Amino acid sequence: MAFDKDAFLTALDSMTVLELNDLVKAIEEKFGVSAAAMAAPGAGAGAAAAVVEEKTEFNVVLLDAGAQKVSVIKAVRELTGLGLKEAKDLVDGAPKNVKEGIAKADAEAALKKLLEAGAKAEIK
């Protein structure tokens, strides 16, 4: 039986994603290999520096106070502990960081509080 590469490629081209997944699993079992990407040989410290680290510190940025400015000022005061004048100045000067270098859960809670007050805000 002669191997016809073109026929094989045509058959692969007509397969669905599920069929291709099953094919990969069968090849892995048959030949004892893995479809996982291998690390390039000889990649030293330069490759290690290229690894993307998961971000652990987040900033909550107030983009706009919206129509409920008083509610947003109250929320900013609660989140930051600032006085009334400082919180008003922060809100008036948007876009500004409300909280900086905080954990993801804290950033999400602060964002939720600002959004509920009527502000436009985001996490960076």
UniProtKB/Swiss-Prot annotation:
Disulfide linkage: none
Descriptive protein name: Large ribosomal subunit protein bL12
Keywords: Ribonucleoprotein, Ribosomal protein
Listed NCBIfam families: L12 (TIGR00855)
GO MF, one example: structural constituent of ribosome
Subunit structure: Homodimer. Part of the ribosomal stalk of the 50S ribosomal subunit. Forms a multimeric L10(L12)X complex, where L10 forms an elongated spine to which 2 to 4 L12 dimers bind in a sequential fashion. Binds GTP-bound translation factors.
PANTHER family to which the protein is assigned, alphabetical: 39S RIBOSOMAL PROTEIN L12 (PTHR45987), LARGE RIBOSOMAL SUBUNIT PROTEIN BL12M (PTHR45987:SF4)
Purpose of the protein: Forms part of the ribosomal stalk which helps the ribosome interact with GTP-bound translation factors. Is thus essential for accurate translation.
A single BP term in Gene Ontology: translation
